[in-house]
Amino acid sequence: MARRENGVQASEDKQGLGKSRQAGLCADTIIMTMDGELPARDIAPGDRIITRDAGMAVLLGVRRKRLRCDAIQIKAGSLGHKRPPEDVILPAGTQILIRDWRARALYASAQKLVPVQDLQDGEFVTLLPAQDLDIVEFIFDTPHVIYAGGLEIGCQTND
């Protein structure tokens, strides 16, 4: 069953990859903030993050952890013109906003938040072997879509 967050339809994991459910961003992922582009590792509560849905949101909290999880690699330019601008690695459960032919073809929707693992095609969006990643999760008062690594990434609340 799908749910709606800030007017964007979000999907639920149907693949049940277990440890793949981990979401977040790798610590070196570049985030768009009101102070410019910063790596996720340098962002702290109180920072103002640029969002697709609200323009700007104040970050309430940050979770940092190192763990072993499945990861997805998205090759540069594979999700649109310069989207992402360079190869990006994300934990497999990270929600990504798609709003192109993929959303229409796969979900009959103009835009949709989906776990990045659901976009695997074996060539441009590929599953990497489980690996140790430094993960950063952002916590907001309401769900938001942020700009991270040249992609639009869904961030949740502290539920």
PLM region descriptions:
Residues 1-39, 150, 157-159:
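Protein maturation boundaries and topogenic segments
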Residues 41-48:
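Structural motif
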Residues 39-40, 58:
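A sequence-level detector of short linear motifs
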Residues 26-33, 50-56, 60-159:
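Long beta-strand-rich cores associated with HINT superfamily self-processing modules
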